Amino acid sequence: MNITTPTQPIRTPGDILANIPGILGFFPAESAILISIQPSPHGYSIGPVARLNLGDVPGALQEVMDAFHCGNPEIIFCFVLSQRREAELWDILYSLYRFEDRSGLGIDACWLAEELSTDTAYDLTFGHATESGEGPLQDWMEGTIPAISTSHSMRACVDNGLLPELTRSDLVQRFTAQNPYFAEEEISAMERCAEELAQQMRAGEGYGTTDPVEVVEHLIADVYYVLSEVDSLEEALENEELLCVAAMWMSTTWTRDLVIKDLLAAPQEAGALLLAVARTFHLSLIHI
């Protein structure tokens, strides 16, 4: 089977493993990595990816699969990363093998590796047959992880001046609230204002109109203008108006979903602004 990232063919599980740090933004450990494989114009491609703490298996599997169904998953792969002895992982591996979601989709194959590092061995724990049904391809049964530094996702990180963090905690630390320009009371007031505006627009009111269609049109049209005002992360951290507008976008899933396409179209500006939001507001903004 050939699978692709946007520009790079993937021919073995090792190739997938080598791309995981660049996809997640950190090197996971003691984790189960679920990867959806879906059809694309060029064959199969990697779709959404999810990481679970081993202690969350199998409890969180259904929630992950529900999210995967937002795409068009045909195959689900799992990679278990752990330093534990295989006997200690038996219950986890068995629950992965037995799992089937509400639509009947299960995990087609699972591999075990001690860690994500170049030349680390991986082994198939269950799945995946060849087209003839005679058994797995040798490279899909066992192998070693190729150079992580040359994987497509890692090269994309380097090209953008980034490197994956060593741990998930290090990654989360980047988003910890640390805006030095506003006092706690000011931030709380900004958060309340953002939530109220989002709720008002969700109800079809705003921009001087009570026509829900016009509200949506104005909201979407504002994205381009707001992003054009973003010059840097530091300036976004200082700008109360930009922070409030972006916080309003993130306050409900409804507003977030309306603007997400335009945010993705301007990754540098949107990235700086949303990082400023993450470093300013302490609580989760998404309520609906």
Task: Outline where the language-model segments fall.
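Charged, compositionally biased boundary regions
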Residues: 2-22, 27-29, 47-285
